[in-house]
């Protein structure tokens, strides 16, 4: 581990992205360390908060009870950088490709609550605050109530992937491994402000599903509705300039095929 990496602390490291960051060599800890006196080591210069409040997206969510507010207080008191893992959901229905300058007009509770937390922490931390608005991350995640997790469960259990939208619906998908690599690179020298994190590639959901089935070795894709719904792609120009990291359509589809093969083998530990 480099000295630079040692100056970063991943809190909420038990989640999907948190574990991936720790797997890249970043020190991690549960979010409970934020409540402990001296819990954040003296050598830390940057906190990446990778935890998620279980109430987020629900009516009973309270930002005062979200531990991310505690992380922000520690960062402000000690002059640390804080990297927030936000979501493309804060943009709502903004036209694609969505730039960081697009107005934030979230259309659901999750997006509205994420945006409210962004503004709350920005006011407190100023230039020491970096917001990463992340596209659709996918990994080997059967059992998770995510788009990709539900897709894997149904393929394994029923031999099919079922959509309630057109398979031509294009979205910005990014493999978990690439997401973690990009976040780590940005956290080594936090730029401040907003950075979109995604592939920047409008990939048809049907193509992603077919790649998973190719890896699995079988399966069928069925659709109960032909409506194109929630298409989006992020403009990742700033991410490219800051990290030098680029994704390709082939890399995304290869990751999906590998996940399908892993599902067939049944040997990996679910996320």
Q: Where are the model-predicted features located?
A:
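N-terminal Rossmann NAD(P)H-binding glycine-rich loop of SDR-like oxidoreductase domains
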Residues: 2-27
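NAD(P)H-binding glycine-rich loop region in Rossmannoid oxidoreductase-like domains
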Residues: 36-77, 90
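SDR active-site strand-loop-helix element
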Residues: 11, 50, 82-88, 92, ...
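NAD(P)-dependent short-chain dehydrogenase/reductase
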Residues: 119-170, 176
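C-terminal substrate-binding subdomain of Rossmann-fold SDR/epimerase-dehydratase oxidoreductases
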Residues: 164-166, 172-271
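Structural motif
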Residues: 7, 45-46, 81
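Conserved Rossmann-fold NAD(P)-dependent oxidoreductase catalytic core, especially the SDR/UDP-sugar
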Residues: 70-109
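Catalytic helix-loop patch of NAD(P)-dependent Rossmann-fold dehydrogenases
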Residues: 67, 95-132, 136, 143-144
């Amino acid at each position: 581990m480099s000295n630079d990496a040692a100056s970063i602390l991943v809190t909420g490291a038990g989640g999907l992205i948190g574990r991936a960051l720790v797997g890249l060599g970043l020190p991690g800890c549960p979010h409970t360390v934020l409540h402990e006196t001296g819990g954040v080591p003296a050598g830390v210069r940057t906190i990446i908060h990778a935890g998620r409040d279980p109430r987020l997206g629900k009516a009973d969510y309270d930002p005062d009870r979200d531990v991310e507010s505690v992380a922000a207080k520690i960062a402000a008191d000690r002059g640390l950088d804080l990297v927030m893992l936000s979501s493309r959901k804060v943009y709502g229905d903004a036209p694609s490709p969505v730039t960081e300058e697009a107005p934030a007009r979230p259309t659901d509770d999750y997006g509205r609550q994420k945006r409210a937390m962004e503004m709350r922490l920005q006011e407190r931390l100023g230039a020491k605050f970096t917001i990463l608005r992340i596209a659709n991350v996918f990994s080997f995640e059967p059992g998770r109530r995510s788009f990709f997790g539900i897709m894997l469960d149904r393929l394994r259990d029923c031999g099919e992937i079922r959509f309630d939208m057109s398979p031509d619906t294009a979205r910005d998908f990014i493999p978990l491994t690439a997401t973690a690599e990009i976040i780590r690179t940005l956290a080594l020298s936090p730029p401040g402000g907003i950075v979109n994190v995604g592939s920047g590639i409008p990939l048809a959901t049907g193509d992603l599903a077919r790649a998973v089935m190719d890896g699995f070795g079988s399966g069928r894709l069925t659709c109960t509705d032909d409506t194109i719904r929630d298409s989006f792609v992020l403009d990742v120009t700033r991410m490219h300039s800051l990290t030098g990291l680029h994704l390709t359509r082939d890399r995304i589809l290869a990751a999906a095929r590998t996940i399908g093969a892993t599902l067939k083998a049944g040997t990996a530990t679910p996320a």
